[in-house]
């Protein structure tokens, strides 16, 4: 039986309205009763995740910023990784040929250059929001990650530009169809989970994980049991064809799967 369960948030544990369902919360409590360690592995900021965690009355480790930070149950930093300052400086100051909006993250919060109210819809559960600022004024040595939000085809073209400019100095991935992330080289949820599992005296084979986007690829592919959401990006399913696909986040599929796993571990699972 797995000893640690790692969960992506958006498109996985959260429903389409960006809330946690009652069944999901109850199932997470059941996992803790079985002494299974919980880990939320997300692109969201730790400041937001601490608020969400505080509403659940659950102990969980936090992998945030797509692996740039790991926090203990007590809130202590176990691991940190920032963007190379030269990479951050290039991304923030270059005039990219794109209509996508740029968003910069550091330990103090989420920063962008203009009001984009539509982006706040994903944060209604926590009330977390961006701060509008001149992005070029942000110190490059304090940046954890940078992301661009916009049309997918536009982001694909932007990724080509970023790859040419940054070469092998950063890790680029889609955390959603409409979100392209620039992360520290070698930084992803999978590498962060490896650090955390080692800290806990576990192996990745002792872990199970759930996800729906390309920023979950390394995590899902490295654990003992990786589960892909039915609403996942097609690219993720294609990249990990050997992994099982469960149901849709709107049906609280993670809870559905885990309830079966807890109650009938030796029987085959069907998402129906």
Swiss-Prot record:
Primary enzyme class: hydrolase
Catalytic activity: 4-amino-2-methyl-5-(diphosphooxymethyl)pyrimidine + H2O = 4-amino-2-methyl-5-(phosphooxymethyl)pyrimidine + phosphate + H(+)
E.C. number: 3.6.1.-
Stretch forming the signal peptide: none
Coiled coil: none
Positions contributing to Mg(2+) binding: 8, 10, 212
Keyword Hydrolase: yes
SUPFAM superfamilies in the record: HAD-like
Residues of the active site: 8 (nucleophile)
Record key words, sorted: Hydrolase, Magnesium, Metal-binding
A Pfam short name: Hydrolase_3
Cofactor: Mg(2+)
A GO term, aspect molecular function: phosphatase activity
InterPro entries referenced in this protein's UniProt entry, alphabetically: Cof (IPR000150), HAD-like_sf (IPR036412), HAD-SF_hydro_IIB (IPR006379), HAD_sf (IPR023214), HMP-PP_phosphatase (IPR023938)
Assigned protein family: Belongs to the HAD-like hydrolase superfamily. Cof family.
Function: Catalyzes the hydrolysis of 4-amino-2-methyl-5-hydroxymethylpyrimidine pyrophosphate (HMP-PP) to 4-amino-2-methyl-5-hydroxymethylpyrimidine phosphate (HMP-P).
Protein name as annotated: HMP-PP phosphatase
Gene: cof
């Amino acid at each position: 039986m797995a000893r640690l369960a790692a969960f992506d948030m958006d498109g996985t544990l959260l429903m389409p309205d960006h809330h946690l369902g009652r069944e999901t919360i109850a199932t997470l409590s059941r996992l803790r009763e079985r002494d299974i360690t919980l880990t939320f592995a997300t692109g969201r900021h730790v400041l937001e995740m601490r608020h969400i965690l505080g509403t659940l009355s659950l102990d969980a480790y936090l992998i945030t910023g797509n692996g740039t930070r790991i926090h203990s149950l007590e809130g202590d930093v176990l691991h940190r990784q920032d963007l190379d300052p030269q990479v951050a400086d290039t991304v923030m100051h270059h005039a990219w040929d794109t209509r996508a909006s740029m968003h910069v993250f550091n330990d103090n919060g989420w920063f962008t250059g203009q009001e984009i109210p539509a982006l706040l819809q994903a944060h209604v559960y926590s009330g977390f929001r961006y701060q509008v600022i001149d992005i070029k004024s942000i110190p490059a040595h304090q940046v954890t990650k940078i992301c661009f939000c916009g049309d997918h085809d536009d982001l694909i073209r932007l990724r080509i530009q970023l790859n040419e400019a940054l070469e092998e100095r950063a890790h680029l991935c889609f955390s959603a169809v409409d979100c392209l992330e620039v992360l520290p080289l070698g930084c992803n949820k999978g590498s962060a989970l490896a650090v955390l599992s080692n800290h806990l005296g576990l192996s990745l084979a002792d872990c199970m994980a759930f996800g729906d986007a390309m920023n979950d690829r390394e995590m899902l592919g490295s654990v003992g049991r990786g589960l892909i959401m039915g609403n996942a990006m097609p690219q993720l399913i294609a990249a990990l064809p050997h992994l099982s696909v469960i149901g849709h986040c709107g049906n609280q599929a993670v809870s559905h799967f885990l309830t079966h796993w807890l109650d009938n571990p030796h029987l085959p699972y069907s998402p129906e």
